Amino acid sequence: MKKPFYKILYVQVLAAIVIGVLLGHFEPKLAVNMKPLGDGFIQLIKMVIGPIIFCTVVSGIAGMRDMKKVGRVGGKALLYFEVVSTFALVIGLVAGHIFNPGSGFNVDVNSIDAKAVAQYAAKAQSSSTVDFLLNIIPSTVVDAFAKGDILQILLIALLFGGALSAMGERAQMVTDFIDQIAHVFFRIVHVITRVAPIGAFGAMAFTIGKYGVVSLVPLLKLIGTFYLTAIIFVVVVLGIIARLTGFSIFRFVAYIKEELLIVLGTSSSESALPHLMEKMEKLGCSKSVVGLVVPTGYSFNLDGTNIYMTMAVIFISQALNIELTLTQQLTILAVAMLTSKGASGITGAGFITLAATLAVVPTIPVAGMVLILGIDRFMSECRALTNITGNGVACVVISAWERELDRTKLARVMSGDRGETVSATPAA
């Protein structure tokens, strides 16, 4: 029997977002007090992300029985991430030149108050590639889970799963136990997701109530350019990749619409991570590929963030009437490819990576970030939506490359069949 429309999760989340926007606009003081609802939901999701990643990755690797395969999947994933991320950076740069969102501002650099972005600049200077690599190694196993650091948990899971794989049948009992624990945590996620509309309402009401729709007006061109560019990236770049892999990007987006709406409401792509992993398995991707690709993509495959970074640099240079040479722009691209990974997992990562990138081009003052500080919150939704879509597509692509994509199940799900399907033999 079909559910009444008002009981469907994405309908509830969409309605909650609309109500949140209305409350924020008409009753801003009351709306600001709704912030704990959004924060609470995100905290509930973050509470289970670590255990889910650990159990899923360990179970997947232990089931491979071949560490060469683990390295092969990881290598293909990183190669894919780097190529697609570079496309995103270039598209952001080109779009900035085509639409010129910063032209006409004519801001005097001496009139900018840099105090508001000083903390981001300081963090950018203290963050290096070496620091990033060292921070992947946790001081203790417990510390990694206590902080909820995805990369640290992923490292522990890789080592633990590799050890179980090497032990073979002797470790089967442990592998089965961890697999059952994963099912328990996914069930917890289902329970938490029931309150997603409340979280989306609280987060959206706070955003509109605190910043107001009026604050967007002076920078609407930049916001519009960024959203349009992100849509073009998803439809064209990810669309072509999806078509070459054998599925439609539009049907894929429709398939993960609930996760996208949760991300839209909370501005946090992490809030949908557990559900995305489960959805990818139901789509026909193998558990081992899902466990490796999706968590890794949350640090190394940030397409929306990459578009934002290069476009923001161009916007600031145009607003300050600073001409960038071709060499400087190529340098920005090269540095952004590194900084976008080096600050993953850090609070305010988008601004920190932007500060680190600007620091390489002395002609653009880091203080110029003040110009977009006020609207960054409104652009974060688009970054998160693009990031999660890109990671979902990457998971399907890597599964296809590994010949571990169940195309029968993929075709059924993409055609609208959401019921249980009998797994067919995986095909390329």
Swiss-Prot record:
Origin species: Ralstonia nicotianae (strain ATCC BAA-1114 / GMI1000) (Ralstonia solanacearum)
Pfam families named in the record: SDF (PF00375)
The entry's function note states: Responsible for the transport of dicarboxylates such as succinate, fumarate, and malate from the periplasm across the membrane.
The answer to keyword Membrane applying to this record is yes
Cell membrane is among the record's keywords = yes
Membrane topology value: Multi-pass membrane protein
Q: Give the source lineage, highest ranks first.
A: Bacteria, Pseudomonadati, Pseudomonadota, Betaproteobacteria, Burkholderiales
> What GO cellular component entries does it have?
plasma membrane
**Residue stretches spanning the membrane:** 5-27, 42-64, 77-99, 150-167, 188-210, 225-247, 314-336, 351-373
This one is known as C4-dicarboxylate transport protein 1
UniProt xrefs under InterPro entries: C4_dicarb_transport, Na-dicarboxylate_symporter, Na-dicarboxylate_symporter_CS, Na:dicarbo_symporter_sf
User: Please, one GO biological process term?
Assistant: L-aspartate transmembrane transport
Could you tell me which PROSITE patterns the record lists for this protein?
Answer: NA_DICARBOXYL_SYMP_1 (PS00713), NA_DICARBOXYL_SYMP_2 (PS00714)
Superkingdom, natural source = Bacteria
Q: HAMAP family this protein is in?
A: C4_dicarb_transport (MF_01300)
UniProt family annotation: Belongs to the dicarboxylate/amino acid:cation symporter (DAACS) (TC 2.A.23) family.
Cell location: Cell inner membrane
State the encoding gene: dctA1
> What's a single GO MF annotation on this record?
succinate transmembrane transporter activity
Principal place of residence = membrane
Q: Which UniProt keywords apply?
A: Cell inner membrane, Cell membrane, Membrane, Symport, Transmembrane, Transmembrane helix, Transport
